[in-house]
A protein has these predicted regions:
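Bacterial N-terminal signal peptides that target proteins for export
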Residues: 2-12
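Sec/Tat signal peptide C-region and signal peptidase I cleavage site
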Residues: 20-24
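Hydrophobic alpha-helical targeting segments used for export or membrane insertion
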Residues: 13-18
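Subset of outer-membrane beta-barrel
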Residues: 25-345
């Protein structure tokens, strides 16, 4: 009997989460460095090239419940503007998330624009301001909702009412993010770089963000601070430090780590680079990462080893994440190749 109740009780817990004041955690990825727009729209364009396209897929909690599946697709196009060393990045992010037995789904379509102001005649120091905003829709499959009201005294009875009434099974809203970043070369070596950024997510505080349509429910703004440092170790090797700190209401998250990288061929213009390292999501997971660049493409694979209170139930298993990226210069007069020196992250 206890086994028969696990599924409805689990679904009931998920349902409770859906009916709260939308204080749930935003979509996030362990390979956060492959989703720059999601971190901070002012990080758009901070790469070597004119165009960058990135796709990330995450599959989580297979060992505990119905898998949580999340996907991200983003694109950026960078071009010089004016007669100085400034440039502009146009881009966008599409997110899809499906979670749990009630098939809670979210779709985000978010165009972005970022302006990069040059602070140096050497074209190696920039202050960037970015905005991203668009449409978000969330939905559930009410036919898959089960609760303990469907327990008839002897077992689970799907013919009984769930006892829950939703005014709507989907809702949508507009969402906006603003951010700033500072990026610069470190010292005389053009390969050594740093960036710092801060972003304010959900600045418009969208209301009625619940399946009950309650106007008192609103999105809680989120602050995200970002850091990236890239330093040469030798002619053939370098390391990259990356970190994010997020705060949304009472929820905080710290994610940080490093990648060690080896150039596998020409040291000046390597086509093949192998990266390996690990990240820590504080009190939640250790995340080993491997990445291979074969320019203009790159693929990365990571895995979350669970450290949280779910570790006994999940046997330490978390989620697997895969990413594919493409970036290069384009042979056009408005290319940024000769106009800027971008951090080589």
């Amino acid at each position: 009997m206890r086994k028969g109740l696990l599924k409805p009780l689990r679904s009931f817990l998920i349902l409770l989460l859906l009916s709260t004041e939308a204080y749930t955690q935003d979509i996030h990825f362990s390979q956060f460095f492959e989703t720059p727009l999601l971190r901070n729209p002012a990080l758009a364009g901070i790469f070597t090239g004119d165009i960058r396209v990135q796709a990330v897929y995450r599959n989580q909690w297979n060992s505990v419940t119905v898998p949580y599946q999340t996907g991200s697709f983003s694109a950026e196009y960078k071009k010089s503007v004016g007669s100085g060393n400034d440039f502009l990045t146009l881009g966008g992010e599409i997110l899809y998330d499906k979670a749990g037995t009630v098939a809670l789904q979210a779709t985000h379509i978010l165009p972005a624009i970022t302006y990069h102001k040059s602070l140096s005649d050497e074209k190696n120091m920039y202050l960037s301001l970015g905005f991203m905003g668009g449409w978000v829709q969330r939905s559930i499959d009410r036919s898959k909702v089960t609760t303990n009201s469907q327990y008839d005294g002897t077992g689970f009875n799907p013919g009984l009412s769930t006892g829950e009434t939703f005014p709507r099974n989907s809702y949508s809203y507009l969402d906006g993010t603003a951010g700033m970043s500072f990026s610069s070369q470190i010292g005389e070596n053009t390969d050594n770089n740093i960036y710092l950024g801060v972003a304010y997510h959900h600045f418009n505080k969208a209301t009625k963000v619940s399946f009950y349509g309650n106007p008192n429910y609103e999105m809680i703004p989120k602050w995200v601070g970002s850091l990236g440092v890239r330093m040469n170790i030798s002619e053939y090797a370098f390391f990259t430090l990356l970190a994010d700190y997020s705060k949304q209401g009472t929820f905080t998250e710290t994610l940080a780590g490093a990648l060690y990288s080896w150039k596998l061929d020409d040291i000046e213009e390597p086509k093949y680079i192998l990266h390996a390292g690990a990240f820590l999501r504080w009190k939640d997971a250790v995340i080993p990462v491997t990445k291979l660049e074969f320019k203009p493409f790159a693929v990365a694979l990571s895995y979350d080893a669970n450290l949280s209170q779910l570790k006994p139930a999940s046997n330490g298993h978390g989620g697997i994440e895969m990413s594919l990226s493409y970036q290069k210069y384009i042979n056009k007069p408005n290319s940024s190749a000769d106009a800027v020196r971008c951090p080589v992250f």
